[in-house]
Amino acid sequence: MATVELGYDFTKTYTSLTPTPKDLDNTAPKLGTIFESTDGKAYRFVLNNHSSDLVIGDVVFLDKTASYPNAVSVLNTDSCGAVAAGVMAGAAMGAIPAAGYGWIQFAGVGSANWEGTTDIVLGDSLKGVNSQVYVVKDAALAATATYVNHMRALAAYTTNAAAVGTNNVAINCRVW
């Protein structure tokens, strides 16, 4: 089900910021548009500056190498540590095509992909992984976040399967 607030469908994606004559009433929001809801969730309209399509729940990083200030990518040179490198930006809200546009959630309770080869306890801090679309347990500190931009597990996960699954998280990726 689409998340719709005040006319925004956060699962809608666009291949261009320029409307076609058939699509004048469905123009893409301005790149960088931020929407904050009354329930603490926050969204940003971004460019997927990566060569692969994103799906709902994919974790993305701020692409500071891009010419656009609101571009995201799955690439991150140091797992969101250095300001000059990638910073975890949030989770994709829809299937954003490569070089396309769509919404990411950067704050509040949401869903994100996480990798489950390590037990995750409710409240554990989750950190991004370079060149991956998921978060993992921040094993060094468990409940204390290593990085300013992080996610927090809202469920326990003890399956220890290598597969990536989408689970509930508290997203805290406000620093850009």
Over which residues does each language-model region extend?
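Glycine-anchored, exposed beta-strand/edge motif detector
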Residues: 2-176
